[in-house]
From Swiss-Prot:
Transmembrane segments: 45-65, 73-93, 122-142, 167-187, 196-216, 239-259
Residues annotated with N-acetylmethionine modification: M1
Cell location: Membrane
Chain location of the short sequence motif NPA 1 per the record: 102-104
Protein's UniProt keywords contain Membrane: yes
Protein name: Aquaporin NIP3-1
Membrane-topology annotation of the record: Multi-pass membrane protein
Length: 323
């Protein structure tokens, strides 16, 4: 909707103009009804498949190595592996697909209008396929036998309650709530420092595994539990790892949405002292200003002209923003 319409090097003026102005509701509806059959969407699905496969293979490999070779990895090591692989995949694939790797995250994003509903089934299918294939490769590579559902055979890389179902359900809810709350904070809120989103999310996974891993297995992800369950045919208490993460993710996203919602827009809260102009006014800012930025406030659908001096490197450092 918004595009850079003019960059003048002599006066270092930056103008963000609005072409073919439309309401924020119209723009949201167009963004949330993205076509299903497109090269871009196929690329996203491939990204979700690769990211989920890598995450499950690396994380579950750490579990197998720890159980097979005398526990050299330990619980903190396993937690660190999961956190690191998620962080790496976020920075590798986040710009392609959004790096969900988790059906609960995709559903929560869609419920909070941060992701198109019609793309959720495709994302979930790609995530489940990646998880299932990763579990199959793990079983083949490590020669894990069939008698794992009883927990008396070789290592089972799936998840199962080591305590009561109620306790495990609550732990999965809390862990997934924490994860989705952090994801919503660092990945969807412009007030956050987006470049550190991957680190924050990875660190949250490490912490969640440390406190919930010994109790529920710290799934936080229906695909993470479903893939191994399908390969080994272990379905006992599987519902717990589908229902609880989805409820936890929805609750985390909605709770952060309450923090985001205010009577004033985000721009009005932290960006004061700008000269307001009409949404139909094409008036340019004073050429006496060194840096000029024209933006639109989605809440009020009005234009604002903002300006500030350059920084010590001669670059525009716009500190005067919406009001």
């Amino acid at each position: 909707m918004a595009e850079i319409s003019d960059i003048t090097t002599q006066t270092q003026t930056v103008v963000l103009d609005i072409e073919n102005y439309q309401s924020i509701d119209d723009s949201r509806s167009s963004d949330l009804s993205a076509p299903l059959v497109s090269v871009s969407f196929v690329q996203k699905l491939i990204g979700e498949f690769v990211g989920t496969f890598t995450m499950i293979f690396a994380g579950c490999s750490a579990i197998v190595v720890n159980e097979t070779y005398g526990k050299p990895v330990t619980l903190p090591g396993i937690a660190l592996v999961w956190g690191l692989v998620v962080t790496v995949m976020i920075y590798s694939i986040g710009h392609v697909s959004g790096a969900h790797f988790n059906p609960a995250v995709s559903i929560a994003f869609a419920s909070s209008k941060k992701f198109p509903f019609n793309q959720v089934p495709g994302y979930i299918a790609a995530q489940l396929l990646g998880s299932t294939l990763a579990a199959a490769v793990l079983r083949l590579v490590f020669h894990l036998d069939d008698d794992v559902c009883s927990l008396k055979g070789d290592v089972y890389v799936g998840t199962y309650p080591s305590n009561s179902n109620t306790t495990s359900f609550v732990m999965e809810f809390i862990a997934t709530f924490n994860l989705m709350f952090v994801i919503s904070a660092v990945a969807t809120d412009k007030r956050a420092t987006g470049s550190f989103a991957g680190i924050a999310i990875g660190a949250t996974i490490v912490l969640d595994i440390l406190f919930s891993g010994p109790i529920s297995g710290a799934s936080m992800n229906p695909a993470r539990s479903l893939g191994p369950a399908l390969i080994w045919g272990c379905y006992k208490d599987l519902w717990l790892y589908i229902v609880s993460p989805v409820i936890g993710a929805l609750s985390g996203a909605w709770t952060y949405g309450l923090l985001r919602s205010t009577k004033k827009s985000y721009s009005e809260i932290i960006r004061p002292n700008c000269n307001k102009v009409s949404s139909r006014d094409r008036q340019e800012a004073s050429q006496d200003e060194i840096c000029v930025l024209r933006v639109v406030d989605p809440a009020n659908q009005n234009y604002f002209i903002c300006s500030s001096p350059t920084d010590i490197n001669g670059k525009c450092n716009v500190t005067c923003k919406l009001a």
